[in-house]
Curated annotation (Swiss-Prot):
Alphabetized InterPro entries for the sequence: Epimerase_deHydtase, NAD(P)-bd_dom_sf, NAD(P)_dehydrat-like
Record family assignment: Belongs to the NAD(P)-dependent epimerase/dehydratase family. Dihydroflavonol-4-reductase subfamily.
Upper lineage: Eukaryota, Viridiplantae, Streptophyta, Embryophyta, Tracheophyta
Pathway in which this enzyme or protein is active: Secondary metabolite biosynthesis; flavonoid biosynthesis
Enzyme class: oxidoreductase
Known EC number: 1.3.1.112
Role description: Produces the terminal flavan-3-ol monomers required for the formation of proanthocyanidins or condensed tannins in leaves and flowers, as well as in the skin and seeds of developing berries. Catalyzes the double reduction of anthocyanidins, producing a mixture of (2S,3S)- and (2S,3R)-flavan-3-ols.
Name recorded for this polypeptide: Anthocyanidin reductase ((2S)-flavan-3-ol-forming)
One of the Pfam families matching this protein, by short name: Epimerase
Amino acid sequence: MATQHPIGKKTACVVGGTGFVASLLVKLLLQKGYAVNTTVRDPDNQKKVSHLLELQELGDLKIFRADLTDELSFEAPIAGCDFVFHVATPVHFASEDPENDMIKPAIQGVVNVMKACTRAKSVKRVILTSSAAAVTINQLDGTGLVVDEKNWTDIEFLTSAKPPTWGYPASKTLAEKAAWKFAEENNIDLITVIPTLMAGSSLTSDVPSSIGLAMSLITGNEFLINGMKGMQMLSGSVSIAHVEDVCRAHIFVAEKESASGRYICCAANTSVPELAKFLSKRYPQYKVPTDFGDFPPKSKLIISSEKLVKEGFSFKYGIEEIYDESVEYFKAKGLLQN
């Protein structure tokens, strides 16, 4: 059978292996000695899977064709796995119809993967990648607010006010809620990891949109700078983590028997003006804008990773290291001058 790996090795399935987070997660799992099954929509798409084929040199990696809309396509990749990491999610920021382009497929994808997990008797734990967008969006006022795993994004506000790109936070919130409902009803050991905006470098051939967004103040991309401002206005802060720490957190909560529930993964909380000031000082060679007029200079909230840290996790990267690596990555990609 295609799914058989050497006996005695822990086996993990990573759903959506071509993505920014998933591909690095595959790499770290292989480096830890796991046998890995990963799913992709089209294994014949060389551009999308070439970095995964290169990772096969690191260890026992099998690539499967699977589609989030097809429940049965996950049976083979999940069979025999100890852990299942569901990282894939549909993203169409410019969608005219978020309900059908993002929200319904995200919920359906989560349920389809979890149904396959219930049939595979080997699965000990399912780890779902959620998003800070499922936690932070609310109509709370004031500054100095702290949000943690108890908080959920206000879906009624999103679906009635429909702020720009509302479909993404709505899809992440509703997909995570659907996962918890299914896990409870079917006795699945589920953990969700809730990352903030991620930066660093990527194994994928395309530059991930989140690194582009994080780097916008340095590249001067006005459209993306407005995206950062929109993020601060909608979610209350600009919060960031290194993609490697996010992947390490996924593996940490999978392996930690006492882990349960939701875990926010956030290394630093800031605002657009504060971040611009920091970047302008650290990288004076780039023309980082620092005048934002009457735009709110401070974030209204802090996204807390206290629960993850108390569990025993330590972050490798602070905001300095996150941006140093992102700058080097953009230089290597020819997107920044030296």
